[in-house]
Amino acid sequence: VTASCRLGLIAQGGAGWMGGSEYIRNLLHALAAAGNPEATLFCFQNAVDDWRETGVQIAPVQPLWQAPLVDRLGLNNRHFAAALRAHPVDFLYPLTYGNRENIGLTFPLRRTLRQTRWAGWIPDFQHRHLPRFFTPAQAAFRDQGIARLLAEAPIVVMSSGSAADDLRAFYPDYAGRVEVLRFATCPRPEWYEPFTGSELASIPERFFAVCNQFWLHKNHLTVFRALAILAERGIRPHVLCTGALDDVRDPAYPAQVRAALQQNGIADQVQLLGLLPRRAQIELIRRSVAMVQPSLFEGWSTVVEDARVLGRPLLLSDIPVHREQAPPGGRYFPAESAEILADLMANAWENWPAGPDLAAEASARNAAGIRLAEVGRCFLEISAPR
């Protein structure tokens, strides 16, 4: 990419999907690490303050007109088109099947984007692998949105080789457009400094950390069953969970989580901390004995990358993408085997010290800088004219 190539990124995520906003923040840091710090961030006008700390130029987009006819006529696209005229870029990323919620765009996109080069992003194909977690309407929304995206996207970015293989299998006609961008966490300097916040004032000295939103596929219940097994052996570790207690796909799930704590007799061992500020979440991971990542499915796991840059060991579900991420110090268990997870947790609880491990952090921090620059260079190659 030449110095004159202007890059535009579209805001993702928010309180309902923290992984999306971290994805964009880390990509901005990766570009800076690769020597290309200039970018324009497109976000809704009411989200500008959420992104101001990134320091990049922000292109605000007027909010949606909420009316079905407006969508059918593509009138909301005019708001994004106006922002793009005011802040022109040469390459725009990521366009997704959730564009309407992220930035107010509906398909088709040709008239809106005109000559701007762009790439689509499909985080994963979870609805194909775990259809039991989706209603027919939810699965159809994803399938239809992905089909519309693929019909127009000149490039489709996937976050892992595993996800790219899925796209080639499910949509073989589009295999030639696939690029893989494995993202990385950018460690901030303050993460390695003494923590001064009050959010962790009442936590125990030793604990396992589980840092996932409370969605069904994140598989918290297997962790709770493992704790029940350990309790029968007289081993009672603490587990601290972060993440919003809210699953839009299954609103009853948070109640099931709380009920499981009572039914398994582990309510006094598990703290549900809710959605913590990012710095407090990072400190929680630093201090943990290990992070437990029990997810049944991921496109690429942000929390695995977080643990990597903090030098913390992980107990991970044995799913293809976790094997692909291959974090140092990872120990794997079959995703729904509470028994094997219990064995791993018992060994870690009895033999591993709590963090932080300053030597491991220093090594991980150095490796993270190299890894981040590689991500930035990979993105610059994807965005280059072809």
Label each residue range with its predicted role:
Residues 1-386:
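Carbohydrate transferase catalytic cores enriched for Leloir-type hexosyltransferases
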